[in-house]
């Protein structure tokens, strides 16, 4: 499963701040989703951190705060600054520093950006970073991340009323004992139903529609026309 040498044992790094984790996640995400704009300028990085969709929690960080987070990540070698542009641009070095294959990096990135997720949610939300064949393959890489030394993710206790355990990254520190899954928690688990998978997909699509609507309104404002004219006849 592991395609990166010695990834199971890596030097531990200090716990990241919430904003450092967000910055790192944004850099990995944008490398895949907007490769033409990567590495990112400080402005683009700040916009990515403050995105309203695909982020939990939603932030309102300033460029100065983001730059402080970048400096902290640079000291850990997790972020590098390019020297080929007049405008400073930043790129991540997460895979090499943490010894992660691309599959594990994709899962860790979604956890950094969206918070706790089930394996099914991770498969849907990571599709633009890596296409997992099925939920079992997601779980295999999560188990591998949890078995790393130090562990990079942990399985959380199941939320009452939910059928699946969620997972959380550990790059920003340990989670409380009460949140951890206990041995035997999965014994009475019920496989994720098709209905639940559809609900997760509907949420993802709703987020995407919201993003596109915002883009349409912005374009309409720039063109000086009514936003409704852009969708007339649909």
From Swiss-Prot:
SUPFAM superfamilies, per database record: Winged helix' DNA-binding domain
One Pfam short name: DUF480
The disulfides recorded in the entry are none
PANTHER family listed in its UniProt record? UPF0502 PROTEIN YCEH (PTHR38768:SF1)
What HAMAP family has UniProt attached to this entry?
UPF0502
Q: Which family does it belong to?
A: Belongs to the UPF0502 family.
Q: What is this protein called?
A: UPF0502 protein Bphyt_5265
Q: Which organism is it from?
A: Paraburkholderia phytofirmans (strain DSM 17436 / LMG 22146 / PsJN) (Burkholderia phytofirmans)
């Amino acid at each position: 499963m592991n395609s990166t040498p010695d990834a199971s044992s890596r030097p531990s790094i200090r716990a990241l701040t919430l904003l450092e984790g967000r910055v790192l996640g944004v850099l990995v995400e944008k490398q895949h989703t907007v490769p033409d704009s990567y590495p990112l300028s400080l402005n683009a990085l700040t916009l990515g951190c403050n995105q309203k969709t695909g982020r939990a929690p939603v932030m309102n960080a300033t460029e100065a705060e983001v730059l402080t987070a970048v400096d902290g990540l640079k000291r850990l070698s997790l972020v590098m600054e390019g020297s080929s542009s007049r405008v400073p641009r930043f790129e991540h070095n997460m895979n090499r520093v943490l010894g992660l294959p691309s599959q594990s990096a994709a899962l860790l990135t979604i956890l950094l950006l969206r918070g706790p997720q089930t394996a099914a949610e991770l498969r849907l939300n990571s599709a633009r970073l890596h296409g997992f064949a099925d939920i079992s393959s997601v779980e295999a890489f999560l188990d591998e991340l949890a078995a790393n030394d130090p562990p990079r993710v942990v399985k959380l206790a199941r939320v009452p009323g939910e059928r699946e355990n969620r997972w959380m990254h550990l790059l920003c520190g340990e989670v409380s004992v009460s949140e951890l899954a206990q041995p035997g928690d999965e014994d009475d688990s019920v496989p994720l139903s098709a209905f639940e998978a559809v609900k997760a997909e509907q949420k993802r699509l709703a987020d995407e529609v919201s993003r596109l609507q915002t883009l349409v309104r912005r374009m309409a404002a720039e063109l000086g026309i009514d936003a409704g004219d852009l969708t007339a006849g649909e």
